[in-house]
């Protein structure tokens, strides 16, 4: 099972049980679109939802989480995982928080995984979105751990930019060519800097010698 329906959520919540849902995959796979959809469904179901995004990701908006297709959701822009915990604790004093959404989890510090677990242990549904692999094809931090810890995992695929086949890798492009191995790990530039690639079309970055 990769996602619960509202009736199943109500059954779990009757026991005040929290859990972790992870939405992952490569660039342009629709992760943020699915992330926003799930949080909106829960909001419509009268759950109190708070969403967070890392301050490094300001491609489209500072105040909203926005997908490549234009779907958007109000969010808190935070610099660290500790800010998430502080805001949730403050908001809980005003009204109970039922659901937390964390976008682009790979851009947060590594303490975010422990905080996500604490929130779930305290009865909060935590829905997380992030890339599973970096541009080198290696596991991305935080997502690699959440793949093990999450109760529900949805892995999405894109279409290969070159051949149209199923893609599960993110190719970083610099000056029309695949980036070198030693390029910075994090570069948030959207479609101008990345392409979804399949196994066959993905070019493993070369090490600069």
UniProtKB/Swiss-Prot annotation:
The keyword Plastid does not apply. One of its GO terms (biological process) is DNA biosynthetic process. Zn(2+) binds at residues 160, 163, 198, 201. PROSITE patterns: TK_CELLULAR_TYPE. Pfam families: TK. It comes from the Bacteria. It is found in: Cytoplasm. Its EC number is 2.7.1.21. Signal peptide: none annotated. GO terms for cellular component: cytosol. ATP binds at residues 25-32, 103-106. The active site is at residue 104. Its main location: cytoplasm. One of its GO terms (molecular function) is thymidine kinase activity. The keyword Kinase applies. Keywords: ATP-binding, Cytoplasm, DNA synthesis, Kinase, Metal-binding, Nucleotide-binding, Transferase, Zinc. It is an enzyme of class 2 (transferase). It catalyses: thymidine + ATP = dTMP + ADP + H(+). Belongs to the thymidine kinase family. Homotetramer. This is Thymidine kinase.
């Amino acid at each position: 099972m990769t996602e619960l329906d509202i009736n199943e959520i109500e059954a779990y919540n009757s026991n005040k049980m929290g859990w972790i849902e992870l939405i992952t995959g490569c660039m342009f796979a629709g992760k943020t679109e699915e992330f926003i959809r799930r949080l909106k469904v829960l909001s419509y179901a009268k759950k109190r939802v708070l969403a967070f995004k890392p301050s490094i990701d300001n491609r489209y908006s500072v105040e909203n989480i926005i997908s490549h297709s234009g779907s958007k959701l109000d969010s808190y822009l935070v610099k660290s995982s500790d800010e998430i915990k502080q805001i949730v604790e403050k908001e809980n004093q005003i009204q109970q928080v039922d659901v937390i959404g964390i976008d682009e989890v790979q851009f947060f510090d590594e303490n975010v995984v422990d905080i996500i677990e604490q929130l779930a242990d305290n009865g909060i549904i935590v829905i997380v979105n992030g890339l599973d692999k970096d541009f080198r094809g290696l596991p991305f931090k935080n997502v690699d751990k959440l793949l093990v810890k999450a109760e529900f995992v949805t892995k999405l695929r894109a279409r290969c930019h070159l051949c149209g086949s199923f893609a599960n890798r993110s190719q970083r492009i610099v000056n029309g060519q695949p980036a070198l191995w030693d390029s910075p790990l994090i570069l948030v530039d959207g479609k101008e800097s990345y392409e979804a690639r399949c196994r066959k079309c993905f070019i493993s970055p070369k090490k600069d010698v």
